[in-house]
């Protein structure tokens, strides 16, 4: 796929989308080829610019996402003009999505390459990547910008081996009147101590993250990766700076470079400009040293895609045969009380409906998600098929709501003393339910029966409160969409 791109170079270089292109629908300007993966706030797709033939990356972001953060990312990319930072070409509104058109880096992220090859990087490879990354950070920091999420997953390589900084979803701008920021943003294992402690931080917070990234490239994962992220957040500020698991495997120059990055006091930590003069970085070899590992990773990815396609084709054939056998058989849907019927099938619901691209490669050490126990394993998407549920008439909902209200009111009147006091209905703060032992079975049953309608009422109040906050935001977005089609 990439060899075709090299044999057929773009007819001219795309620098920025012109006004004529930006007033068209994005499908008129681009052909979307495939999904590349997930970034902060949206999905990323590979596409081709029809006029020039240039490959680009398009991030599609739902407008329900944090629009302020999306606009911040666009603003930062617009202001940047560096070979070491991913370029921004333009943006579109399409239905409920914002399309952000960016530079395409064909080799993917450094973490993608490590996982595809199932190998960590050599010192020479790390030095070359760090040199380009430091040039990108030097540029950002000169512009008074902090990236705040430096890690191998946010360092992209093009097919020639040039490293570029990407994913500015959490980047921040420093001003003269706000020399240090006080917000905790980033990925836990890569966070600088001062970021976690919220004591204010500046551009050298990125340097700490770069030191952790250097260890990540050398060992395959950052320090503390084997413990819970919340525990790591407490350990990073209190423990001494992390080092290599086996320091004897690495040169003195590399060890010293990491040591210079991982200084706990930000005032004593080296800057990007200073680290570009470090012997480990100054002795870095050219980008040609990265071509072998890039080609190896792309070969692995291509083979996996071909294998997946064969499995899909085989499944399609099997499903086609099953559809022929099952056609015309109608059964009642499980839990369907309104008489709706559906076609019976031996296929399980949702089988083979989502192909997980290997180039997506979700990092196990990525952005922290709390309370994610309900997520399916191996990236499986859990689908809720609302079309199978029978529509409930509005009059039925009205009577059900009235019945719940009557139940709540009647409980307050009919239940005996122990239950009439509203304070008794609250969950005891100390978790002590001993008082229930003195109640009769009838009292307990009435209390149990009252919980469901009370819960429904509380949920409805929360829903209305959420809607009252959400609607003005949606109205503002709609107003902006009507006033302008693009940025």
Curated annotation (Swiss-Prot):
Biological processes, Gene Ontology terms: apoptotic process; intracellular signal transduction; protein tetramerization
Coiled coil regions, renumbered to chain: 290-310
Residue numbers carrying Phosphoserine: 265, 320, 410, 414
Keywords on record: Acetylation, Apoptosis, ATP-binding, Coiled coil, Cytoplasm, Kinase, Magnesium, Metal-binding, Nucleotide-binding, Nucleus, Phosphoprotein, Serine/threonine-protein kinase, Transferase
Catalytic residue list: 149 (proton acceptor)
Record keyword Nucleus present: yes
Location (main, coarse): cytoplasm
Biased composition (Acidic residues): 313-326
Site (described: Cleavage): 326-327, 349-350
Highest rank taxon of the organism: Eukaryota
MF terms (GO), sorted A to Z: ATP binding; metal ion binding; protein serine kinase activity; protein serine/threonine kinase activity
Region of interest (Disordered), residue spans: 303-332
Catalytic activity: L-seryl-[protein] + ATP = O-phospho-L-seryl-[protein] + ADP + H(+); L-threonyl-[protein] + ATP = O-phospho-L-threonyl-[protein] + ADP + H(+)
Pfam families with a match to the protein in the record: Mst1_SARAH, Pkinase
PANTHER family assigned to the protein according to its UniProt record, in alphabetical order: STERILE20-LIKE KINASE, ISOFORM B (PTHR48012:SF2), STERILE20-LIKE KINASE, ISOFORM B-RELATED (PTHR48012)
Protein's recorded name: Serine/threonine-protein kinase 4
Organism: Aotus nancymaae
Name of the encoding gene: STK4
């Amino acid at each position: 796929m990439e060899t075709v791109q090299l044999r057929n170079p773009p007819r001219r270089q795309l620098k920025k989308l012109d006004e004529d292109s930006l007033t068209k629908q994005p499908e008129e300007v681009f052909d979307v080829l495939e999904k590349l993966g997930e970034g902060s706030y949206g999905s990323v797709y590979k596409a081709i610019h029809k006029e020039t033939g240039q490959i680009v990356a398009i991030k599609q972001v739902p407008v329900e996402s944090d629009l302020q953060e999306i606009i911040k990312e666009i603003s930062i990319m617009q202001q940047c003009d560096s070979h070491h930072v991913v370029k921004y070409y333009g943006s579109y509104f399409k239905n409920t999505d914002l399309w952000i058109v960016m530079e395409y880096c064909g080799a993917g992220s450094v973490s993608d390459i490590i996982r595809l090859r199932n190998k960590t990087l050599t010192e020479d490879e790390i030095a070359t990547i760090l040199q380009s990354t430091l040039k990108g950070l030097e540029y950002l920091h000169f512009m008074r910008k902090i990236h705040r999420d430096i890690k191998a997953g946010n360092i992209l390589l093009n097919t020639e081996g040039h490293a570029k900084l990407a994913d500015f979803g959490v980047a921040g701008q420093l001003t003269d009147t706000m020399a240090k920021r006080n917000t905790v943003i980033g990925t836990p294992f890569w966070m600088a101590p001062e970021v976690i402690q919220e004591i204010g931080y500046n551009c050298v917070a990125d340097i700490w993250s770069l030191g952790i990234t250097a260890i990540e490239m050398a060992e395959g994962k950052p320090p503390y990766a084997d413990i819970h992220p919340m525990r790591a957040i407490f350990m990073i500020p209190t423990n001494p700076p992390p080092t290599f698991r086996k320091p004897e495997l690495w040169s003195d120059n590399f060890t010293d470079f990491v040591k210079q990055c991982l200084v706990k006091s930000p005032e004593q930590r080296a800057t990007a400009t200073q680290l570009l003069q470090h012997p480990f970085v100054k002795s870095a070899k050219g980008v040609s040293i990265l071509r072998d590992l890039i080609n190896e990773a792309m070969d692995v990815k291509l083979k996996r895609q071909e294998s997946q396609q064969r499995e899909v084709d085989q499944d399609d054939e099997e499903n086609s045969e099953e559809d022929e056998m099952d056609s015309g058989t109608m059964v009642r849907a499980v839990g369907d009380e309104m008489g709706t019927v559906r076609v019976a099938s031996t296929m399980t619901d949702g089988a083979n409906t989502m192909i997980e691209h290997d180039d997506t490669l979700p990092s196990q050490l990525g952005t922290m998600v709390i309370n994610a126990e309900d997520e399916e394993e191996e990236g499986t998407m859990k689908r809720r098929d609302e079309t199978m549920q029978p529509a409930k008439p509005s009059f039925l909902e009205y009577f059900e709501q009235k019945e719940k209200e009557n139940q709540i009111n009647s409980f307050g009147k009919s239940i005996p003393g122990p239950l009439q006091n509203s304070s008794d209905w609250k969950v005891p703060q100390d978790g002590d339910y001993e008082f229930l032992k003195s109640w009769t079975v009838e009292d307990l049953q009435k209390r149990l029966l009252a919980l469901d309608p009370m819960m429904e009422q509380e949920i409805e109040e929360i829903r209305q409160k959420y809607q009252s906050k959400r609607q003005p935001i949606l109205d503002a977005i709609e107003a902006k969409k009507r006033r302008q089609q693009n940025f």
